[in-house]
Amino acid sequence: MRNLAVFDTGPGIVGLYEVHRDYLNYYVDDKFEYYGLYNREAVNERIKFLEKSFKKAKKIIVMDFDAIDYFKNSSKAFYGEEALKKNLKDKKILCLGSKLTCQEETLKIFTDSPVDYLDVPLLINGANDGVADDIMKMICDEYFKDFDFSKYKMIFLASSGLHLKKEFFIDYFAKRVLEIEIYSNVDGILEDYTYKKENYIRDYFYVTGSKSAFYSRAEKYLRERGLLKERELLNVSRLFKKGQ
């Protein structure tokens, strides 16, 4: 029985084809050529199309921050809500995200804290595609030239792609401001998620191929906490396409 779905989108969302890495199964949906350049109607239309593929899932982990608006009233949706509400409280926040996240001011779902939004599609694309840190630095330098970070207590990475480069962002911003917290939507998910060991973890993922490193990090995260033993593999069940 499939009991968990992880929903994510990115540069791509069409075909649901499979990529195998690190003992995990990936389902890559390749529709949008560039991340963050689509509107709410396009996002909702695509989710509705995909939803039938994971309609039997008992829980849907929503890693795509732009999809939260669609899933926020679903009893099956999980996106680290409790952790986000706790960690975003009483802080002046700079939110780095997609154009849609900025337009909808998505963080208002989780906090009354003052939030400034910055649309960073080039950073999200770079993070998703795993570009080198020196290229990420060049992009950041362009975005944040003459930027005053002194009024912020937190920089929120509103993208699972940006989360992949979290260590880079910690180092980058540490050189520009003495003390600032870096937190992402994926941090909230990892903080709230309760891992239950089974012989096989019957999960399946809707992700972009370039985000495969996240699942390696998720596996490392579980090992460090003793939830996944040294020689135990984090496996996912196969999802077969029907009528596609």
Which residues are covered by each model-predicted region?
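Non-catalytic structural scaffold of enzyme domains
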Residues: M1-Q244
